[in-house]
């Protein structure tokens, strides 16, 4: 499970890590956000639907790399996690990444005069508010989640190269799975 603030690089790192480990990749956004709306990421499935959709994917995948934020439903999935990764990055970098990602995905819709301009502006403010506790997802909430986990947790910097972070996750995974012996002890 890779968790952290928007724009930290969870999805990119999750995809790369899953590829390296030969595991399924589950992007939480795919299971929680409705796609039948005029404006993307404005309506979620009901809590029950989110749990059922993700539970089905987890059951089908067996072993997997999951990435995203699942604050309101994580308790249903925590027992599946053997390793959790808390990925962070500086707020300015995260805001820049999110802006670039949304601009690439939605083009002029997020620019001044576009039908998503206001939503985009509010989302960027939300991303910037993660550490301050003013965002919809907060550092405090994620830390409480991490503190409740019984699996191994590693902390990574989303500003670091993807390959080095993927390697760190792979090494931690192999240790958790008993495939690598610790040296020097």
Residue ranges and their predicted role:
Residues 2:
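Hydrophobic anchor at the beta1->P-loop junction of P-loop NTPases
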Residues 10:
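Conserved lysine of the Walker
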Residues 15, 19-59:
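Conserved substrate/cofactor phosphate-moiety recognition/catalytic segment
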Residues 21, 80-81, 149:
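Short, structured coil segments at secondary-structure junctions
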Residues 46-92:
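Glycine-rich phosphate-binding loop used to anchor ATP phosphates in small-molecule kinases
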Residues 83-84, 88-137:
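A glycine- and Lys/Arg-enriched "phosphate-lid" helix/loop adjacent to the NTP-binding pocket
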Residues 125-185:
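NTP-dependent small-molecule kinase module
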């Amino acid at each position: 499970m890779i968790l952290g603030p928007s724009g930290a690089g969870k999805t990119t790192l999750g995809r790369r890590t899953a590829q390296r480990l030969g595991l399924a990749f589950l992007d939480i956004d795919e299971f929680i956000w409705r796609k039948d709306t005029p404006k993307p990421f404005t309506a979620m499935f009901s809590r029950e639907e989110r749990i059922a959709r993700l539970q089905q994917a987890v059951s089908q995948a067996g072993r997997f790399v999951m990435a995203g934020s699942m604050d309101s439903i994580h308790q249903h999935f925590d027992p599946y996690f053997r390793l959790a990764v808390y990925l962070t990055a500086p707020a300015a970098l995260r805001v820049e990444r999110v802006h670039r990602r949304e601009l690439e995905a939605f083009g002029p819709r997020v620019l001044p005069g576009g039908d998503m301009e206001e939503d985009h502006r509010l989302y960027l403010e939300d991303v910037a508010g993660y550490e301050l506790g003013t965002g919809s997802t907060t550092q405090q909430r994620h830390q409480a989640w991490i503190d409740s986990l019984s699996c191994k947790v590693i902390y990574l910097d989303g500003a670091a190269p993807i390959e080095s972070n993927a390697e760190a996750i792979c090494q931690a995974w192999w240790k958790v799975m008993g495939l690598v012996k610790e040296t020097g002890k």
